């Protein structure tokens, strides 16, 4: 069995952003204690059942850094003793306002080697609308302290399509990210999810038009690459060698184990998940079955999110035959519109194709 990825969900936040639809909430110390105990239990139990190793650990949320640093280290050290290889990539998502000196001391001790920091925007007005407290000075301080702690693999989150955002304000955010020296950016187009404050206010906020957001996306891709930060997935950019190993497992349709409320797993061709219910997870209930995974359609859908696209080599290695001719013919219909390219028998989307990825990919693979 190849090395899997390990994801641990920490559903706690001090405050919820108005656009966020992830499973997260404020919690008291007793709830956090019981939750961490349940995570440690599931790490032990799953290691006995699976008999495999993981070469990536991603602790996401929520805001994992709102946990006491000792709790985080307990989780990471347990993951090391049960699953992780010696060279594992260990990522912790964090909010700049929840990072004190003890955090950096502890994560350095337990060999965290990657941080993902929520910036979203370097523009004060945009951050206020997004409910983000941390400004440029706080984020730069965190980046500097992380590097002093020996963590140089740092990612910043950036958001496009923010109310009031312009190409000029986006460029200012990108310039800040570039000047901070981080080697990775995750840049997402804001999606208005139901059951969020943004959804209820959608007619009252000055969202950029779809055309303006598309122009900003294309500008961002070109601007970052001019500065050596290369696009490798629809929403992800990195200095070569600093791509997220964990997230590449998802896009390569590789196996991963998810632990925690709302966490999903893909193992043995089956997709399972824990519901968005913390007490369900704490009580030790089993994962629910989502269905089969890893078929040709899913593999192609995920591969086409990558800049490298769907290659004959990777497809053949997985399914022992070439990409179906029908799929290649469908892709060629979009090639003439500049939305994808078919080279060496493979398929990859152009940047304009990425903007329409949901519809283009579904048409190609169906």
Predicted regions and their residues:
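Immediate flanking context of iron-sulfur cluster ligation sites
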Residues: 2-10
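C-terminal scaffold of the Radical SAM
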Residues: 3, 24-45, 52-321
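Local cysteine-cluster metal-coordination motifs and their immediate loop/turn environment
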Residues: 11-22
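C-terminal alpha-helix/helix-terminus motif
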Residues: 47, 158, 360-364
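Short amphipathic alpha-helical interaction segments
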Residues: 321-333
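A short, conserved structural fragment
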Residues: 335-345
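Minor-groove-contacting beta-hairpin "wing" of winged helix-turn-helix DNA-binding domains
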Residues: 346-350
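Short, amphipathic alpha-helical interaction segments positioned at domain boundaries
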Residues: 352-366
């Amino acid at each position: 069995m190849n090395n899997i990825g390990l994801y641990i969900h920490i559903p706690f936040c001090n405050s919820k952003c108005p656009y966020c639809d992830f499973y997260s909430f404020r919690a008291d110390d007793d709830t956090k204690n019981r939750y961490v105990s349940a995570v440690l239990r599931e790490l032990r139990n799953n290691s006995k059942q699976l008999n495999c190793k993981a070469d990536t650990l991603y602790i996401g949320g929520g805001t994992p850094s709102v946990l006491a640093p000792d709790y985080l280290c307990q989780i990471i050290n347990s993951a090391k003793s049960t699953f992780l290889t010696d060279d594992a990539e260990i990522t912790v998502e964090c909010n700049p306002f929840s990072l004190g000196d003890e955090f950096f001391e502890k994560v350095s001790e337990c060999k965290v080697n990657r941080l993902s920091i929520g910036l979203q925007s370097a523009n004060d007005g945009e951050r206020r609308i997004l409910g983000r407290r941390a400004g440029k000075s706080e984020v730069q301080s965190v980046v500097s302290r992380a590097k002093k702690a020996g963590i140089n693999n740092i990612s910043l989150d950036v958001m496009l399509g923010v109310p009031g955002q312009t190409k000029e304000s986006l460029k200012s955010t990108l310039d800040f990210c570039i000047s901070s020296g981080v080697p990775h950016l995750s840049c997402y187009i804001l999606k208005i999810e139901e059951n969020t404050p943004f959804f209820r206010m959608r007619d009252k906020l000055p969202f950029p038009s779809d055309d303006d957001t598309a122009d900003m996306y294309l500008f961002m891709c070109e601007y970052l690459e001019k500065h050596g930060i290369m696009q490798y997935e629809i929403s992800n950019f990195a200095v070569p060698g600093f791509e997220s190993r964990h997230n590449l497992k998802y896009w390569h349709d590789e196996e991963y184990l998810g632990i925690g409320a709302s966490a999903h797993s893909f193992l043995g061709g089956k997709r399972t998940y824990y519901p968005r219910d913390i007490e369900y997870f704490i009580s030790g209930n089993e994962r629910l079955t989502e269905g089969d995974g890893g078929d040709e359609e899913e593999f192609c859908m995920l591969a086409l999110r990558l800049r490298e696209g769907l290659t004959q080599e990777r497809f053949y290695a997985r399914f022992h035959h070439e990409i179906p001719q029908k799929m290649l013919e469908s892709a060629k219909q979009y090639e003439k519109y500049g939305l994808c390219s078919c080279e060496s028998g493979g398929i990859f989307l152009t940047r304009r194709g990425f903007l329409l990825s949901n519809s283009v990919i579904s048409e190609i693979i169906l």
